[in-house]
Amino acid sequence: MDKSLFEQARPILEQIQDNGFEAYYVGGSVRDYVMGRNIHDIDITTSATPDEIESIFSHTIPVGKEHGTINVVFNNENYEVTTFRAEEDYVDHRRPSGVTFVRDLYEDLQRRDFTMNAIAMDTAYKLYDYFDGQQDINNRIIRTVGIAAERFQEDALRMIRCLRFQSQLSFEIATETFEAMRTQMADIKFLSIERIVIELTKLMRGINVEKSFNHLKSLKAFNYMPYFEHLDMNQINVTEPIDLELLIAIVSVKFDINYSLKPLKLSNRQVKDINQYIQIMNALPSIFTKEQLKIFVYDYDTNLIKNIMVAADVLKANDIQGHEPLIVNLQTIDETLHHLPMHNRKDMMVNGGVLMAHLNAKSGPWLKDVLRQIEIAIVTGKVSNEETEILKWVDNHVKI
């Protein structure tokens, strides 16, 4: 089992211990270590206060000092070091009104969300598992630490995180945990949509997404999310992992809607991808010739095209017409892309200025149309991408 990331962080824990404090690995890295999965981020918990951590290490960043978290920079890596803490009453089902620093590991672990995430480990790889997290991991069960209703009342996002973990790990959800989710799911309306979107993005890429997505529907989670609340999400089916952006595009195409995406507070890149997914899905059923395929591959992001093609079963499950597989498939997409004479308009050897000078014409609506005609002619092989050849073609084929 790969311990390299733990070993890279070991000097931090040892330095904290050398100064008379406790320090442990904690959270997802320990869970994944117990499961034999690849480890990514290392989180450290300690009895030292943020001020004490800052006095021990020369290079620190107070990313969340008021909540007990200090980033320690070691060997050009950032390590999140958080003081043992007990959280005060939560407000709005999403954040504690304050935190109290404590010196006891048990008290820190009992505030965490799920038993599998409430295991600590020392530098000798000894596990501190007060809530039977290893047993739940072995039984492939997601269970809250303590009373589920209390954990979800503290932070409603834990319910979406639970479904995300189910999707990623293919675990079952403990009965009492699931029943608390059924009772309290409406509380996610108090959450920021940004936090929900982060979890949904991971959930949609999980290997067990079909089950988790069906739980989102049965628990009526979508009823309490901006954008989705206006839609009958029970009509949407997800049978395999897809991007969240593709899901939103599928919803738009299936219901033939053009709702504003602003309530989801997505990045400009995400919005651009969603709009292009919609255009691709609408264009796919109309491609029957190699010439049409060339224009299609030229016009759209081939990575997004491939994502849609890989998700063909999801489109079918939502009654969205797919592509003609003999003309449009992963191989023909790659071959067509490879042989395109140019990949965007910037590659074209003429521009609007050249055209206006050649035709002795002023700018107007005609210019955009002619540039598009030239693009298509080059992409489909009717004219080579050379200025003299293009202008000859314009003289013979274009009227303004």
Curated annotation (Swiss-Prot):
GO terms for biological process: RNA repair; tRNA 3'-terminal CCA addition. Keywords: ATP-binding, Magnesium, Metal-binding, Nucleotide-binding, Nucleotidyltransferase, RNA repair, RNA-binding, Transferase, tRNA processing. Gene3D superfamilies: 1.10.246.80, Beta Polymerase, domain 2 (3.30.460.10), cca-adding enzyme, domain 2 (1.10.3090.10). Its cofactor is Mg(2+). It comes from the Bacteria. CDD domains: NT_ClassII-CCAase. Catalyzes the addition and repair of the essential 3'-terminal CCA sequence in tRNAs without using a nucleic acid template. Adds these three nucleotides in the order of C, C, and A to the tRNA nucleotide-73, using CTP and ATP as substrates and producing inorganic pyrophosphate. tRNA 3'-terminal CCA addition is required both for tRNA processing and repair. Also involved in tRNA surveillance by mediating tandem CCA addition to generate a CCACCA at the 3' terminus of unstable tRNAs. While stable tRNAs receive only 3'-terminal CCA, unstable tRNAs are marked with CCACCA and rapidly degraded. Belongs to the tRNA nucleotidyltransferase/poly(A) polymerase family. Bacterial CCA-adding enzyme type 3 subfamily. This is CCA-adding enzyme. It comes from Staphylococcus aureus (strain bovine RF122 / ET3-1).
